[in-house]
Design a protein with these regions (language model features):
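Flavin-dependent oxidoreductase catalytic core characteristic
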Residues: 1-125
Length: 125
């Protein structure tokens, strides 16, 4: 897995390269992004747990006061798993020789949007 800075640079570069959806390594890049996002979500969960723990246990009162943070963590974990599943989907279709232009565009748009939001801010409602 690439270091966070390296992955951030690759994702940011991909956002500016309109032809990147044709990259034959797109599925691998999405799988890498999914792994990095899952690692980030794991770090965020550990950090939040440490912040909310009192005496080695998560405090209900602290949890009540951190609803925005826990909601954000849930969204981050959801986006991370979505990237993993998108990467798996693309790999499966590639093995079956069914990964065409439409699938590549779906992958590029979906993964690109999730990566952009992970890096720039996840909108919550």
């Amino acid at each position: 897995m690439a270091a966070d800075g390296d992955l951030r640079e690759r994702i940011a570069g991909a956002e500016h390269d309109q032809g990147n959806w044709q990259d034959p390594n797109l599925a691998a890049l999405v799988a890498e992004a999914g792994a990095a996002a899952k690692a980030l979500a794991g770090e965020a969960a550990r950090g939040l747990k440490a912040r909310l723990s009192v005496g080695g246990r998560v405090s209900g009162r602290a949890l009540d006061g951190a609803q925005e943070a826990t909601h954000g963590l849930a969204w981050l974990a959801t986006y991370a798993e979505s990237l993993v599943q998108l990467g798996d989907w693309a790999a499966r279709l590639t093995r079956e020789d069914r990964f065409g232009e439409i699938e590549r565009l779906v992958l590029s748009i979906g993964a690109g949007e999730y990566c952009a939001q992970i890096l720039g801010g996840i909108p919550m409602n």
